[in-house]
Amino acid sequence: MEGTSESPILDEFEANSNDYDNEFISRFSQNPLHAFSLFTNGNIQEYFMNNSLEKIIIHIVLIIISLCGIKAQTSKIIYIVRLLFWKMYNVINNLVNKMINREKIADRQIVDNRFREFEERFRILLLQHDENIAKQDNIVQYNKLDNFAESIKSEFNLKVAEMERRFQELKWRCDMIANKTMNTIVLTNTVDSTNKDEKIIFDEGSVVQYNRE
């Protein structure tokens, strides 16, 4: 069983990438127990520092398989372990992608909510602006109507004042005519009364003179 292009992730797990790995494979291929000599020469710290976690796990799995008495080719065992890690990688990657997708969905929902909130605020702002414009238009119309009413009121007051002035003038003329008429009547009555007194009252001298004649 060999690697294919369908599993490119397997190429990242190269077992023969450093001296420690090559030495481990060579000793393990001769005798699995010889691999333990790498850990008895005081190089265990350097071994763990120079090998990745995947390779260390592969080496441990190979040692366990060999100690259990299962004899198989090293390359096939390594490939099987690679497949196992590839499967684990896919599972973990799928889980990570699901979590990322959930976060993206959550972020998208947050963005949608923010956008809807902004849209609602913008709509309310437009309504308020329209209401303000309508109020201003109403105020302008009211001011125009009020000015028109004030002009009519002023004109009416002027007409009333003019009518009152004419009425006062007419009243004054009527009073003048009435006074003249009354004066004429009084004078006439006075003259008539004087004439009547002259006819009724006779002077004694005049009477004596009349008798003589």
Curated annotation (Swiss-Prot):
Q: What's an example of a GO molecular-function annotation for this chain?
A: toxin activity
Q: Which InterPro entries match?
A: Rotavirus_NSP4 (IPR002107)
The membrane-topology field of this record reads: Single-pass type III membrane protein
What main location does UniProt list?
Answer: host cell
Q: Which residues lie on this side of the membrane: Cytoplasmic?
A: 75-213
Where does this protein reside within or beyond the cell? Host rough endoplasmic reticulum membrane; Host membrane, Host caveola; Secreted
For this UniProt entry, which segments traverse the membrane? 52-74
From the record, what ranges are coiled-coil? none
Entry comment on modification after translation: The N-glycosyl content is primarily Man(9)GlcNAc, with a small amount of Man(8)GlcNAc.
- Which GO biological process categories is it annotated with? monoatomic ion transmembrane transport; symbiont-mediated activation of host autophagy; viral process
Q: What is the superkingdom listed in this entry's lineage?
A: Viruses
Gene Ontology CC annotations of this record: extracellular region; host caveola; host cell rough endoplasmic reticulum membrane; membrane
Keyword annotations for this protein, in alphabetical order, are:
Activation of host autophagy by virus, Enterotoxin, Glycoprotein, Host endoplasmic reticulum, Host membrane, Host-virus interaction, Ion channel, Ion transport, Membrane, Secreted, Signal-anchor, Toxin, Transmembrane, Transmembrane helix, Transport, Viral ion channel, Virulence
Tell me which parts of the chain lie in the Lumenal compartment.
Answer: 1-51
Glycosylated residues, per the record, are N50
Quaternary form? Homotetramer. Interacts with the immature particle in the viroplasm. Interacts with host CAV1, early and late in infection. Interacts with host integrin ITGA1/ITGB1 heterodimer. Interacts with host integrin ITGA2/ITGB1 heterodimer. Interaction with microtubules blocks trafficking to the Golgi apparatus.
Q: Which family does it belong to?
A: Belongs to the rotavirus NSP4 family.
Function (record text):
Plays an essential role in the virus replication cycle by acting as a viroporin. Creates a pore in the host endoplasmic reticulum and as a consequence releases Ca(2+) in the cytoplasm of infected cell. In turn, high levels of cytoplasmic calcium trigger membrane trafficking and transport of viral ER-associated proteins to viroplasms, sites of viral genome replication and immature particle assembly.
Q: What is this protein called?
A: Non-structural glycoprotein 4
